[in-house]
Amino acid sequence: MAGRSAVSASSKWLDGFRKWYYNAAGFNKLGLMRDDTLHETEDVKEAIRRLPEDLYNDRMLRIKRALDLTMRHQILPKDQWTKYEEDKFYLEPYLKEVIRERKEREEWAKK
């Protein structure tokens, strides 16, 4: 039983650290999500290209708003910040698919 409580305590501590780091990064204060801040490699660019139109438009709106806020040296009101619990990794499934396809092409090229 002691092992489970230690795991639970470390899990809570780790989750608390994740939330702290999420807020410390600052992108949420501009209304951005984690996937909006990814470095745009070729794989990420292809994943963005494959996004459904509504997700792509939402992403562009968040990025444009963040740029505007940054230019004016402002942040959103606290009630409009992206919350850790609400941030979803919307790009991840598309990115995994792109990476899988690229690795498959590389394997075929080796043969």
UniProtKB/Swiss-Prot annotation:
It is found in: Mitochondrion inner membrane. InterPro entries: QCR7, QCR7_sf. It comes from the Eukaryota. The modification N6-succinyllysine is found at K12, K78, K88. It is a peripheral membrane protein. The modification N-acetylalanine is found at A2. Keywords: Acetylation, Electron transport, Membrane, Mitochondrion, Mitochondrion inner membrane, Respiratory chain, Transport. GO terms for biological process: cellular respiration; mitochondrial electron transport, ubiquinol to cytochrome c. One of its GO terms (cellular component) is mitochondrion. It holds the Pfam family UCR_14kD. Its main location: mitochondrion. Signal peptide: none annotated. The modification N6-acetyllysine is found at K12, K19, K78, K83, K88, K96. Component of the ubiquinol-cytochrome c oxidoreductase (cytochrome b-c1 complex, complex III, CIII), a multisubunit enzyme composed of 11 subunits. The complex is composed of 3 respiratory subunits cytochrome b, cytochrome c1 and Rieske protein UQCRFS1, 2 core protein subunits UQCRC1/QCR1 and UQCRC2/QCR2, and 6 low-molecular weight protein subunits UQCRH/QCR6, UQCRB/QCR7, UQCRQ/QCR8, UQCR10/QCR9, UQCR11/QCR10 and subunit 9, the cleavage product of Rieske protein UQCRFS1. Belongs to the UQCRB/QCR7 family. Component of the ubiquinol-cytochrome c oxidoreductase, a multisubunit transmembrane complex that is part of the mitochondrial electron transport chain which drives oxidative phosphorylation. This is Cytochrome b-c1 complex subunit 7.
